[in-house]
UniProtKB/Swiss-Prot annotation:
NCBIfam families: lipB, PRK14342.1. It is found in: Cytoplasm. This is Octanoyltransferase. Its main location: cytoplasm. Substrate binds at residues 69-76, 137-139, 150-152. Keywords: Acyltransferase, Cytoplasm, Transferase. Belongs to the LipB family. One of its GO terms (biological process) is protein modification process. It catalyses: octanoyl-[ACP] + L-lysyl-[protein] = N(6)-octanoyl-L-lysyl-[protein] + holo-[ACP] + H(+). It comes from Francisella tularensis subsp. mediasiatica (strain FSC147).
Length: 206
């Protein structure tokens, strides 16, 4: 496997990072290194390519951005650890389903290893849950064997805006965050811990 370059973008507007992902993916060559971007976004709702407007109950003036990722509407905001995967999955001999399961399993492993939290998935409702409350959302896009978008892990944030929508298209879905279980939850640590688990799983799968 080629080296994966890791870049910490800090706090960035969603639209800027989305445009950068599109440009990176469209201009990369077979020799381009894979990258993982670590980022935090100001408050924004993002609507997946099959997202339904009725799942946004009241935006409360929070911006809404249409994207080309999978899934329905979700919320990003300060205190949420976001990780984007810009990978050549064809070169890595990694199918779309395997990528999704690796993204999910890395989060489950991280929560267990570093925080002693037993997380799980729910069939038909992608994401990571603790006691059936969603702690992480994921949405990916694969174009010509190249992936972008990623996972958002609720870490230490205001969860209120999730009540303004039907998260991921599910009415009444309860959300949680790492700070509910670990008061000193820090997004930088979560991003590094998650990335380490993801890369380990990725290397073991190819």
């Amino acid at each position: 496997m080629n080296n994966i370059y890791q870049e910490d973008l800090g706090l960035q507007q969603y639209t800027k990072v989305f445009e950068d992902m599109l440009e990176f993916t469209s201009t990369r060559t077979p020799e381009t290194n894979d990258e993982i971007w670590l980022v935090e976004h100001p408050a924004v709702f993002t609507q997946g390519k099959h997202g339904k407007p009725e799942h946004i109950l009241n935006s409360h003036n929070i911006p809404i951005v249409a994207t080309d990722r999978g899934g329905q509407v979700t919320y990003h905001g300060p205190g949420q650890a976001v990780i984007y995967f810009l990978l050549d999955i064809k070169r890595n001999k990694l199918g779309a389903k395997k990528l999704v399961t690796t993204v999910e399993q890395a989060c489950i492993n991280m929560l267990d290893k570093y925080y002693n939290l037993k997380a799980h998935i729910i069939d038909g409702a992608h994401g990571i849950y603790i006691n059936n409350q969603k702690i992480a959302s994921l949405g990916l896009r694969i174009k010509q064997g190249k992936s972008y978008h990623g996972i958002a892990i609720n870490t230490n944030m205001d969860l209120t805006p999730f009540s303004y929508i039907n998260p991921c298209g599910y009415s009444g879905l309860k959300m949680c965050q790492l700070a509910n279980f670990y008061q000193e939850a820090d997004i930088k640590k979560v991003q590094q811990q998650y990335t380490a688990e993801f890369v380990t799983l990725l290397n073991n799968s190819i």
